[in-house]
C-alpha cells in the first residue's frame, strides 16, 4: 500500500514551505488519501490499531488535516467526535471546539502530520480549557522534527505515530532515487530531538 503514497502524490520530493514556516525537501499531503477508498481504509486501520491500545471517551480532530480521520475513526470505533478550530469563530456561538462535549471526558487528539507540534499543542490547550482530559495524541506521520518532544515538554501528553519519517522513507526506498533519499536523510539529521 505504501508505494501508492508516491503514485497519488501523498509523498512529494522537491522544495516546499511548510505551514510552520520551515522549508523542506519533502511534503506529505494525506488529504490525497481521501479520494482513494482502498488506501483510506488502510490508513484508518493503521490509526485504529494504535487507538485500540488507548483508553479514551472521545476523538478530537485538529483542523484541518485531522478532521476527516477523526470523523471516520469516531464512526468506525463508535466514539463521539469533535474538532478544534485554529481560532474561535467570530460569529455564531464563537466556539473553538465543535461537536461532542469534551468537558470531563478523556480525549484522544488526532492529526495527520506532525512537524513542530504547534497545532496539537494548541488543540490540547483548548481541550483542557474546556475541561477535557487529554489521554494522548495520534498522528499518521511524525516528520521527526521535534514535534513529539515539543508536545511532551509543553503539555505532558504522549504522541503516538503510525510512521516516523525515517521509517516511511525506508519503506519507500525501492521506489525513489538515491538523491531523494539522501536529501531527506540529510535534512532530518539536523533535527536532534
Curated annotation (Swiss-Prot):
Residues noted as binding orotate in the record, renumbered to the chain: 115, 143
Entries under InterPro entries matching the protein: OPRT, Or_phspho_trans_dom, PRibTrfase_dom, PRTase-like
Pathway this chain belongs to: Pyrimidine metabolism; UMP biosynthesis via de novo pathway; UMP from orotate: step 1/2
GO biological process, one term: 'de novo' UMP biosynthetic process
TM helices/strands, residue ranges: none
GO molecular function, one term: orotate phosphoribosyltransferase activity
Chemical reaction(s) catalysed: orotidine 5'-phosphate + diphosphate = orotate + 5-phospho-alpha-D-ribose 1-diphosphate
Catalytic activity, EC: 2.4.2.10
Keywords from the UniProt entry: Glycosyltransferase, Magnesium, Pyrimidine biosynthesis, Transferase
Pfam families, per the entry: Pribosyltran
Self-association and partners: Homodimer.
HAMAP family: PyrE (MF_01208)
Family the UniProt entry places it in: Belongs to the purine/pyrimidine phosphoribosyltransferase family. PyrE subfamily.
Function per UniProt: Catalyzes the transfer of a ribosyl phosphate group from 5-phosphoribose 1-diphosphate to orotate, leading to the formation of orotidine monophosphate (OMP).
Protein name: Orotate phosphoribosyltransferase
Organism: Pyrobaculum islandicum (strain DSM 4184 / JCM 9189 / GEO3)
Name of the gene encoding the protein in the UniProt record: pyrE
Amino acid at each position: 500500500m505504501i508505494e501508492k503514497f508516491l503514485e497519488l502524490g501523498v509523498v512529494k520530493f522537491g522544495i516546499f514551505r511548510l505551514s510552520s514556516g520551515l522549508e523542506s525537501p519533502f511534503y506529505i499531503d494525506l488529504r490525497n488519501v481521501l479520494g482513494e477508498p482502498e488506501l483510506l481504509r488502510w490508513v484508518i486501520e493503521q490509526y485504529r490499531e494504535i487507538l485500540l491500545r488507548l483508553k479514551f471517551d472521545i476523538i478530537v480532530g485538529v483542523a484541518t488535516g485531522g478532521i476527516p480521520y477523526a470523523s471516520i475513526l469516531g464512526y468506525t470505533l463508535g466514539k463521539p467526535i469533535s474538532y478544534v478550530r485554529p481560532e474561535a469563530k467570530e460569529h455564531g456561538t464563537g466556539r473553538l471546539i465543535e461537536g461532542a462535549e469534551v468537558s470531563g471526558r478523556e480525549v484522544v487528539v488526532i492529526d495527520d502530520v506532525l512537524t513542530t507540534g504547534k497545532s496539537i499543542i494548541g488543540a490540547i490547550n483548548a481541550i483542557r480549557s474546556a475541561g477535557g482530559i487529554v489521554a494522548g495524541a495520534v498522528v499518521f506521520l511524525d516528520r521527526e522534527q521535534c514535534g513529539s518532544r515539543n508536545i511532551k515538554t509543553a503539555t505532558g501528553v504522549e504522541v503516538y505515530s503510525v510512521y516516523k519519517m525515517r521509517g516511511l522513507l525506508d519503506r519507500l526506498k525501492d521506489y525513489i532515487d538515491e538523491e531523494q533519499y539522501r536529501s531527506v536523510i540529510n535534512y532530518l539529521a539536523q533535527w536532534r530531538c
